[in-house]
């Protein structure tokens, strides 16, 4: 049986329990996969704008500092050589992209594994809503009564401004939209708190839309793929327009 989550109201009172969707909250976590996805996500955070100047880019003359022979010094052909003061850097960092290629299936499986870990430990919770008006005091009361950790991840819908304004200034609490839920944020938080609306959007009507491209609009669908008949009609239309232009 898949884990369950306690449902709270804004006052911190338990109003029921909800059986979590099995393939999202009761999967088989793959630690190596989770590590790979989190490392890729952290790498994507890097700006990659680091830059040093080579001997061809530093300012100043590249003249020969002293004659080739007779000084007792090692021969040197430029004042901008790497060993000279003011010289260029050898093999220094240059701007680059740190993004790792991470297939969507890996991202989905890693997130399901992280949520499974939290759900089995009883650290996935659901709140009906954060009320009709934003209130930091009500949010703090909810967290204290329910015993939620100070390292808390709140998952809400993108349109839920009440939740955002209620928790945005509380230390240790991070709020993400349901479409932004990711393995890294789940792992760095001890507890995960879904609003009921966000949970319904995340799992979808039958638990199949959890990782759709537009989780805040689960009713949207991709354009219908063209059928062979459609392709044939389009070809005939193009041919007809060509004949009209050529006068055939």
Curated annotation (Swiss-Prot):
Q: Which residues form a coiled coil?
A: none
Keywords for this entry? Answer: Ribonucleoprotein, Ribosomal protein, RNA-binding, rRNA-binding
InterPro entries associated with the record: Ribosomal_uL4, Ribosomal_uL4-like, Ribosomal_uL4_dom_sf
Superkingdom of this entry's organism? Bacteria
Q: Which chain regions cross the lipid bilayer?
A: none
Q: Name one GO molecular function term.
A: structural constituent of ribosome
State the Gene Ontology BP annotations. Answer: translation
Instruction: Please give an example of a GO cellular component term from this record.
Output: ribosome
Basic and acidic residues: compositionally biased ranges? 233-248
Describe the protein's quaternary organization and the partners it interacts with.
Part of the 50S ribosomal subunit.
Q: What does this protein do?
A: One of the primary rRNA binding proteins, this protein initially binds near the 5'-end of the 23S rRNA. It is important during the early stages of 50S assembly. It makes multiple contacts with different domains of the 23S rRNA in the assembled 50S subunit and ribosome. Forms part of the polypeptide exit tunnel.
What family name appears in the similarity comment?
Answer: Belongs to the universal ribosomal protein uL4 family.
Q: What is this protein called?
A: Large ribosomal subunit protein uL4
The source organism is Tropheryma whipplei (strain Twist)
For this protein's source organism, the top of the classification is: Bacteria, Bacillati, Actinomycetota, Actinomycetes, Micrococcales
Name the gene that codes for it.
rplD
